[in-house]
Amino acid sequence: MPAALLVSKSPPLCGELTVHGAKNSVLPILAATLLCRTPCVLHNCPDILDVTHTLQILRHLGCSCERSGSTLSIDPRGFAENAVPPALAGSMRASSLFLGALLARTGAAALTLPGGCPIGARPIDYHLQAFRALGASAEEEGGTVRCRADRLHGARLRLPGPSVGATENAMLAALGADGCTTIENAACEPEIADLGAFLCACGADLRGAGTPTIEIEGGKALHGATYTILPDRIETATYLCACAACGGALTLRRAAPASCAGVIEALGQCGCRIRCGYDTIAIHRQGPLTACRPVTARPYPGFPTDAMPVLLAAQLGAQGKTSFTETIFENRFLYVQELRKLGAKLSQDGRTVRLQGAEPLHAARLRAGDLRGGAALVLGAMQAEGESTIFGVKHIQRGYDNLEAALQSAGARLKTVEIPIKV
């Protein structure tokens, strides 16, 4: 029987929520543990499907993986493989990060092109160009990527675009190369900086992670380390937008306010009062919500593409008009047609969606087709009269550590059920 979320209109939210570790940080760090010769201990690891799938890959490669609460212990000393099975690789996009780690560790890697959210093309070409610059052969044929190098060498390489995945793969591969590697036009996301900090804790000679230029002195053996994953800025944005949508007051603990500046600014424009501490964010929305200024998703430090769906959903009840433009993933707006089923007045022109807010919303049967779009449907249904049913909850579980329980604790009315019918 398929699982579904039943979501009713929410009262104003109230309480405290703790932000989990960042999905987009823990996944590359888990891949990076393959480069260590001794065990690693990672704190603040979210319990999400993508982490579960990554641990399955590590175990297949010979690593020992144990979880205790939010702490993962990874022992790579049993490492014995250099290929990821298609069934595991196809479960998520982040499996591509094992290419760089395996290439650095063994000089060879094979991987079926990975799956993930169907939000647009995320070509592997940038990754392969980086591997070739380091002296590897790297080809994709029939849906399988194969990389090989007798010996990797340092190089100055410039990425065609600031791709997060390509930056991470280039960093990992460069650690196995002799000499210095300079990565130009690198992605600057906080998760890149977190990966760099973890690698430095393991003994890597690396500078500039989180800036457009990263320098790596490769060829050094890495040891294990104990490390704490940074807070998830997209989960943070989701909670903030939920409060903006439903009203009330929330305090978020273990947050990273600086990484959420774009979302905080947009919600401040809407009439929300937000106060930030060192690792806390308090949001209060009592009066009516007003439309924010038009938002365009851009690479960090621009507005995060992953936060746009939940901000758009929060704006459904806002008074006025606004627009949302996507510049990164061409199919990001798959969820828009589902929000229309709730009565939302949305029009799409290419990569821009225009919203006329404050339209009456009613319950509907919805289907999540991707992770962040699924979260947007939850926030939309929390504003609609009646009880909505959301299918495809596995997409939400890929990246949120029990979103249902967190929102329930703040007063939201939602629950997971098994639906005994085919939909």
Region locations from a protein language model:
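Short, structured segments at the rim of ligand-binding sites
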Residues: 1-423
